[in-house]
């Protein structure tokens, strides 16, 4: 199976130098709709597509891969990418650029946000895979860095080799983080050894779990691309972890004990994003009807509190048979190319960051 990890290791990013393009698509009730007239979604979760939301110039604020987005307490949308001319781009909800910074994260990938004593802080993940000036793919251990929203570094989490948490032959290429209500930090080592690393709020290591070598294979993670704290049950918070190569999420207790598996057939899901009573996720790849992973594919998915898929914008409508979700496919409209992350605002609009998508900026979906 082709994974993003092997893709990065074997070649420079395919998006370099390509021109942005938009494919025409079908709208609900209008099969001749142009891309920005398109309505996508299912079961009341329907959205108008806006490819031109981000009002930036490629000459002054270029993007390579748009990886993750969060919204701060001021309502601003913060994007991380891997172009070191501006790793961080900050927009208002209309798509106007408000600020940009960051020149030292060549593999800028993960972005989470927390609020402490009235101030917003970011956790930036550099996964360690990057492309040098000659276009060659390179690798180094990754890092997780806490900053404020202006880019001032607060601390860097210790790498697991330095604290005896990893063996010498275990790779460390983190992809994403989650922050618990008590400030504890969970790091998903999705392109490395597939552990979830647990630190306290000061960056002191507590434990690790997951990986690929458990006696019970259900406890394993394969491309542990994302992690989120699910607080919908106020008395029983849990961790939702991505196992992207298995097309599923796995649920663990806050101290790493396995609870259950949530299958998403045909959906190579990225990080879970909690918003209200729903889980949202980008689907970085989807499969064809023979189960083969499709390049240039992907969509989004929306899941309820019972872990039932309600809608897959950009994909086919969810179908259940005898309570079992059937495979979901990319819709023929092909709205998305490698949906890597979503950010959902207070109006239920969704901002979609895409990887390897011809240097395109985030797409906005306005709920209708």
What are these regions (language model features)?
Residues 77-79, 121-123, 185-186, 238-240, ...:
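Conserved beta-propeller blade signature
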Residues 1-15:
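N-terminal secretory signal peptides and thylakoid transit peptides that target proteins
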Residues 338-368:
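Blade-level signature of beta-propeller repeat domains, shared across WD40, Kelch, NHL, RCC1
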């Amino acid at each position: 199976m082709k994974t993003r990890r092997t893709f990065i290791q074997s070649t420079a990013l395919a998006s370099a130098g390509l021109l942005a393009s938009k494919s025409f698509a079908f709208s609900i009730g209008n099969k001749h709709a142009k891309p920005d007239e398109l309505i996508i979604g299912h079961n009341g979760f329907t959205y108008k597509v806006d490819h031109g939301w981000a009002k930036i110039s490629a000459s002054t604020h270029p993007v390579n891969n748009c990886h993750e987005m969060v919204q701060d307490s001021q309502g601003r949308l913060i994007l991380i990418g891997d172009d070191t001319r501006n790793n961080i781009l900050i927009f208002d909800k209309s798509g106007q650029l408000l600020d940009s910074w960051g020149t030292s994260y060549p593999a800028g990938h993960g972005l989470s946000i927390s609020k402490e004593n009235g101030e917003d802080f970011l956790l930036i993940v550099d996964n360690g895979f990057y492309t040098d000036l000659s276009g060659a793919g390179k690798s180094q251990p990754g890092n997780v860095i806490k900053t404020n929203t202006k880019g001032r570094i607060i601390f860097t989490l210790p790498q697991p080799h330095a604290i005896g948490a990893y063996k010498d032959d275990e790779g460390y290429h983190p992809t994403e983080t989650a922050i618990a209500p008590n400030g504890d930090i969970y790091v998903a080592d999705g392109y490395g050894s597939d552990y979830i690393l647990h630190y306290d709020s000061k960056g002191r290591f507590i434990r690790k779990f997951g990986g690929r070598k458990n006696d019970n294979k259900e406890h394993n993670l394969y491309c542990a691309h994302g992690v989120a704290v699910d607080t919908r049950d106020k008395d029983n918070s849990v961790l939702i972890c991505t196992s992207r190569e298995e097309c599923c999420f796995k649920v663990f207790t806050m101290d790493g004990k396995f609870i259950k598996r949530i299958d998403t057939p045909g959906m190579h899901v990225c990080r879970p994003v909690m918003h209200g009573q729903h889980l949202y996720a980008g689907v970085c790849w989807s499969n064809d009807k023979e189960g083969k992973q499709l390049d240039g594919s992907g969509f989004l998915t929306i899941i309820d509190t019972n872990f039932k898929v309600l809608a897959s914008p950009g994909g086919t409508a969810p179908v259940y048979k005898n309570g079992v979700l059937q495979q979901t496919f990319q819709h023929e409209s092909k709205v998305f190319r490698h949906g890597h992350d979503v950010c959902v605002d207070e109006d239920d609009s969704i901002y979609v960051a895409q990887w390897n998508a011809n240097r395109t900026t985030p797409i906005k979906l306005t709920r209708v």
